[in-house]
Amino acid sequence: MLVITTTDDSGDSRTRRLARLDSDGRIYVSAHHWPRAWYRRAIDNPEVRVEIDGVESDFVAVPVTGEEFGRVAAEFPLPLPVRFLMGFPPPREILRLDPAT
């Protein structure tokens, strides 16, 4: 798990606890359920703050597409029972969290 802090255009910050997906030495998060405001804020303002194991760091949220999306989605599938419990959510979106430089 991790805690991501995203900021909207007015400068208001919000935090959200998300599942941490570790793949190929990188950190990913997935928007696969109805509460997606955090995802929209990260797309609009990709500089995010992330807490992992009690340590906060700055990251840049990068939308994942193509082959990389397919690989990560296949590595962390959403089983049918989970999708059913979520009410068959909208299509999944994945962000890669790159360390800010």
Regions found by a protein language model. Give the residues of each.
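Short beta-strand segments
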Residues: 1-34, 48, 60
